[in-house]
Amino acid sequence: MLKTQTLEQTKLSEPKMYKVILLNDDVTTMDFVIEILMNIFHQNLEKASQTMLEIHHNGSGICGIYTQEIALSKQKKVIDAAKLANFPLQAKVEEE
């Protein structure tokens, strides 16, 4: 007796990606925002300065695009660092 096997193919899809967005406020210093962008989002000084100016002029700016778990982790790091430095800086995560 012959046995046949059916192979089931699983279709893998790319994970959803999420934007981490910093929100401008009237208290957090530009230098602190640059520090956050360099330390948490690994931007060089030039890129961090550009992103900081975007946040300052537009009210918000995208710092990076990540999988959900990483985006939420970076959001928490931003909020924790801001609280530690007594700044009201906020970050939000949005699906791309």
UniProtKB/Swiss-Prot annotation:
Gene3D superfamilies: 3.30.1390.10
One Pfam family here: ClpS
Signal peptide start and end residues: none
InterPro entries: ClpS, ClpS_core, Ribosomal_bL12_C/ClpS-like
GO biological process: protein catabolic process; proteolysis
Free-text function comment from the UniProt entry: Involved in the modulation of the specificity of the ClpAP-mediated ATP-dependent protein degradation.
Quaternary structure and partners: Binds to the N-terminal domain of the chaperone ClpA.
Similarity comment text for this entry: Belongs to the ClpS family.
Protein name per its UniProtKB record: ATP-dependent Clp protease adapter protein ClpS
Organism: Campylobacter jejuni subsp. doylei (strain ATCC BAA-1458 / RM4099 / 269.97)
